Curated annotation (Swiss-Prot):
Location within or outside the cell: Cytoplasm
Cofactor(s) the record lists: Co(2+); Zn(2+); NAD(+)
Gene Ontology molecular function, alphabetical: 3-dehydroquinate synthase activity; metal ion binding; nucleotide binding
Organism, as annotated: Hydrogenovibrio crunogenus (strain DSM 25203 / XCL-2)
Protein name: 3-dehydroquinate synthase
Length: 358
């Protein structure tokens, strides 16, 4: 088992990475407050891992909530199902919420924990590659609104993140690829040696080699933990994690939540950001081709959906939560491993990107 730490002073917390961790009850006990535990999962993950999770919290008063699976259910109406169970069972302020699932479950459980009685303890047990390397770490929680992704939410850090890599054995190939988009993102924004390693080890990742997967997860989490420790509330440096996300969120919303997976939208969105970076004179065509090649090798889309118009992109991007004073701020690349955030780009180049890169 590997242990990393997200350094946030008194609110620092560990990330445990290894095989078979879900079966280690003693691992969880130091991070549970009170006697009541609410495990939130979904209809896909619960049949596979809920019983094992309940055993990990044996000795506590455990209740469960099983939500429908999919980004289209990440909304306030479905969120209320978590509150309903907590309130009906008189969960108090000492209770612990546990997220058992992918990014949607983690985001919703975290937001429920941030909101219930003005904030209760919660633990992340991410079961998809995307949630293991990205959404479970850093304390971002929330739900979608019909007019935008993650527009309603809060920063609420978990007590710990437990990454049992065995859960990836049951992950669908499409979900694995979606997670690889976020893994590749770390190489693109801050870690060129990791990008090179990914180019060499992508076959092992796709084959679910446990050693290769564990290293990719560890290096991704370390990159995220380092930046979150410096910029918890996304005042500056942490915004680099949004490479491809402004374009990608527009794709997810425009195509209807759940039709494009988050990682798929991010992949196509990263290529749009790469194209704009090239138009800005920052990124070489060689780098553009390398980035496209690794995403395609990971079975990810490198083009946005043709159904979306330029105006639809612009309208959805203008509603993004990262917009400041009406300015769409984007993460662009100077080179692989060197990202920067800017709103200082010619509007005609953004429009040209949306017209030409499709």
């Amino acid at each position: 088992m590997k242990t990393l730490t997200v350094e946030l002073g008194e609110r620092s917390y560990p990330i445990f990475i290894g095989q078979g961790l879900l079966g280690q009850a003693e691992l969880f006990k130091p991070y549970v407050t009170g006697t009541q535990v609410l495990i939130v999962s979904n209809t896909t993950v619960a049949p596979l891992y809920l019983e094992k999770a309940k055993q990990a919290f044996s000795g506590y008063d455990v209740k469960t909530v099983i939500l429908p699976d999919g980004e289209q259910y990440k909304n306030l109406d479905v969120l209320n199902q978590i509150f309903d169970v907590a309130i009906e069972n008189r969960f108090d302020r000492k209770c612990t919420f546990v997220a058992l699932g992918g990014g949607v479950i983690g985001d919703m459980t975290g937001f429920a924990a941030a909101s219930y009685q003005r904030g209760v303890n919660f633990i992340q047990i991410p079961t998809t590659l995307l949630s293991q390397v990205d959404s479970s770490v850093g304390g971002k929680t929330g739900v979608n609104h019909p007019k935008g992704k993650n527009m309603i939410g809060a920063f609420h850090q978990p007590e710990c993140v437990v990454i049992d890599t065995d859960t990836l054995n049951t992950l669908e190939d499409r979900e694995l690829s979606a997670g690889l988009a976020e893994v590749i993102k770390y190489g693109l924004i801050v870690d060129y040696p990791f990008f090179e390693w990914l180019e060499q080890n992508l076959p092992g990742l796709l084959a679910r080699d446990p050693v290769v997967l564990a290293e990719a997860i560890e290096r991704s989490c370390q990159n995220k933990a380092t930046i979150v420790a410096k910029d918890e509330k996304e005042a500056g440096l942490r915004a680099l994690f949004n490479l491809g996300h402004t374009f990608g969120h527009a794709i997810e919303a425009g195509m209807g939540y759940g039709n494009w997976l988050h990682g798929e939208g991010v992949s196509a969105g990263m290529m749009q950001a790469v194209y704009l970076s090239k138009l800005m004179g920052d990124l070489t065509q060689t780098d553009q081709k390398r980035i496209a090649a690794i995403l395609q090798s990971a079975h990810l889309p490198v083009m946005p959906p043709k159904e979306m118009s330029v105006q639809q992109f612009l309208d959805l991007m203008a509603g993004d939560k990262k917009v400041q004073a009406g300015q769409i701020r984007l993460v662009l690349l100077k080179a692989i491993g060197q990202a920067y955030v800017t709103g200082d780009y010619p509007a005609e180049l953004l429009e040209r990107t949306l017209i030409e890169y499709r």
